[in-house]
Amino acid sequence: MELDLKPIELPGIEKKRPMIIAGPCSAETEEQVMDTATMLANKGIKIFRAGIWKPRTKPGGFEGIGVDGLAWLKRVKQETGMYVATEVATAKHVYECLKAGIDVLWIGARTTANPFAVQEIADALKGVDIPILIKNPVNPDLELWIGAFERINNAGLKQLGAIHRGFSSYDKKIYRNLPQWHIPIELRRRIPELPIFCDPSHIGGKRELVAPLCQQAMDLGFDGLIVAVSYTHLTLPTT
């Protein structure tokens, strides 16, 4: 399979494995965001991530700080020099992020599973040239995952990357999401030029599993890691 891709270009970031993206799963307060960003910047991390719109399985939970969080990400960018990344699920999210100067966007697993939603995002991104990362769908459907890349690529986006965050399962004895490594391996075989990131935090669901999952991803030739880190709960591997 051929997509019209080009390498992810973020000036100042070395082209070597692993490219690390880190930050809180959810931006909850400005203080939390800034404390975490400062800590990560001091450790040499160049790309800061934080979710500001959070799709939840059930209503009633915290669904993200919303547009207000974009100002916090802009402050991170201004005060630390880090690139900033967040998740988008609708065209409105895309417009707000582009207006705020967000550097990297990713599409979450629940959104990837909906071709209508992916197409809406693709249409909103036409004429834009920024890195777009796409998480695997919640179910282990490689064709659905590839279809999302095709939709975004057809809109003219060439700096694409995959995020492997595991797959939903009733079996949670070890992992929150089953890794099923053969699926991203097959993705690599089908689209060899597509960089693949591992999300060990969502796969493992436990702090103690993050480092070994990172190592396994590196052993399998993954290109980067996207790790959930907060100021009070550091999960970033030290190696």
Each language-model region and where it sits:
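Conserved, mostly hydrophobic/aromatic
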Residues: G23, F48, C97, D199, ...
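Conserved small/polar residues in nucleotide/adenosyl-binding loops
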Residues: T232-T238
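Alpha-helix-loop-beta-strand connector modules within alpha/beta enzyme cores
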Residues: E63-A85, A124-D129, I183-E193
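N-terminal amphipathic alpha-helix/helix-capping segment at the start of soluble metabolic enzymes
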Residues: M1-I21
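Catalytic beta/alpha-barrel core
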Residues: Y83-T90, D103-P115, P131-P140, I163-H164
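Catalytic alpha/beta core domains of metabolic enzymes, predominantly
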Residues: L125, D129-I226
